[in-house]
Amino acid sequence: MVFQLVCSTCGKDISHERYKLIIRKKSLKDVLVSVKNECCRLKLSTQIEPQRNLTVQPLLDIN
């Protein structure tokens, strides 16, 4: 499962590129060839995280 990733600058959905990186294990260089927008390229390069286990809820400390 790949969590949705949307570029905050242009609003483009770049989940498919994230899928290629995480699931298909393609290199970042190969994936960035098909990405035209500089803002999307930057987001993919800097904000890719591995899959997270969302069954554990983070604790919220209001103090």
Swiss-Prot record:
One of its GO terms (cellular component) is DNA-directed RNA polymerase complex. The keyword Nucleotide-binding does not apply. Its EC number is 2.7.7.6. It catalyses: RNA(n) + a ribonucleoside 5'-triphosphate = RNA(n+1) + diphosphate. Induction: Expressed in the early phase of the viral replicative cycle. The keyword Transferase applies. Keywords: DNA-directed RNA polymerase, Early protein, Nucleotidyltransferase, Transcription, Transferase, Virion. It is found in: Virion. One of its GO terms (biological process) is DNA-templated transcription. It holds the Pfam family Chordopox_RPO7. It comes from the Viruses. Disulfide bonds: none annotated. One of its GO terms (molecular function) is DNA-directed RNA polymerase activity. Coiled coil: none annotated. Belongs to the poxviridae DNA-directed RNA polymerase 7 kDa subunit family. Part of the DNA-dependent RNA polymerase which catalyzes the transcription of viral DNA into RNA using the four ribonucleoside triphosphates as substrates. Responsible for the transcription of early, intermediate and late genes. DNA-dependent RNA polymerase associates with the early transcription factor (ETF), itself composed of OPG118 and OPG134, thereby allowing the early genes transcription. Late transcription, and probably also intermediate transcription, require newly synthesized RNA polymerase. The DNA-dependent RNA polymerase (vRNAP) consists of eight subunits encoded by early viral genes and termed according to their apparent molecular masses Rpo147, Rpo132, Rpo35, Rpo30, Rpo22, Rpo19, Rpo18, and Rpo7. The same holoenzyme, with the addition of the transcription-specificity factor RAP94, is used for early gene expression. This is DNA-directed RNA polymerase 7 kDa subunit. It comes from Vaccinia virus (strain Ankara).
